[in-house]
Amino acid sequence: MKRFTTYLLVGGWALLSASCSAVRECKAPELNLPEQLVAGVTDSTTIADIGWWKFYGDAALCELIQRTLDNNKDMLAAAARVEQMRQLYRIDKASRLPDFSARVYGDRETNDYYQKSFSNDPELGAKVGVSWELDLWGNLRWAKRKGGAEYLASVEEWRAMRMTLVAEVATAYFQLMALDNELSIVKQTLETRRQDVRLAKLRFESGLTAETVYQQAKVEYASTAALIPELERKIKDDGEQHLAAGFGLSGREDPPQRPVAQHHHAGETPVGIPSVLLQRRPDVRASEQALQAALAGVGVAYADRFPRLNFTLTGGVENGVLSHIFESPFSYVLGSVTAPVFGFGRKQAKYRAALAAYDQARLKYEKKVLEVFKETDDAVVTYRNVRRSAERKESLRDAAIK
């Protein structure tokens, strides 16, 4: 018993050492980030807690976004990839469990020895088997971890694409509304210029003003009229067709409709704490899961260098006569060890390649975090500046009305 306990402890220590050794050469990511954003945001709530349908509050825009998400080809492809990775992850999880199989067979063998006589040897049987690989070095455990990380990465990539599409559709929608408003203002200005031309003509014909005043009014009218075709082209090409392309409409369909009324968003948008914003970014999460998958890939490659132990348990019945088939049961246990002996460095090269893949994923993760940190800082500063500018313009408008 004491000797068995010693062997068990030694074996456990060997397994633990192998598991730790698998990733000991993997360098942890280095993130040299400032303690806080330049903007100094400390909101306890965040925009990430608000659904896009609540944030925009525009029925036409929300319908357009939803239909875009339902029809966009990239979104559909990303959803299919998520399903693919989910099923592959199920395969990796099932690999750690025993494999059950069953077989029913029958054959009849005829032998002719030296052309003297024929002998018939019928055989009927049924058997079931259970095979299981003992995960000594963590091959299957690392493979499961790798599959899970790849599945989660695909989910985060889908969420990142969804977030990008929502932002793109909303941006194009508001740009289109701005063009509509600009066109409306230009048309109103054109009508004013037409009245100015009429009055300038009357004054000139009455001798009250010189001809240059009348000609100047005509120039201003023509200049304003020239703006309308360009604005209509922008609305058609840059606005409606861009929305239709993202929406997934064919060229024969009409572009989605939108109201011309001015959109209002009440209240200040809660930005949130920088660390929370970084943690909840889908692209950051996807990069982090890709890093975890690469780390698990190192573990798989490392464990693949060691022997693999398989057990098979088979039992059944077999007889040459069907009526007596249950009189001859059988069973056996088979164990096998498969060990790499000499492969000209293939296993070591595979392990080194996995380490290089991990380094790539680590550097991409570090780069992504730095990029997102800067994007978040710039977005917060831009949002505050634009909001202050809008408030000042609204004050000027109110003062002009008064």
Can you say where each PLM-predicted feature lies in the sequence?
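Periplasmic alpha-helical coiled-coil/stalk elements that build and connect Gram-negative outer-membrane
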Residues: 140, 149, 156-273, 386
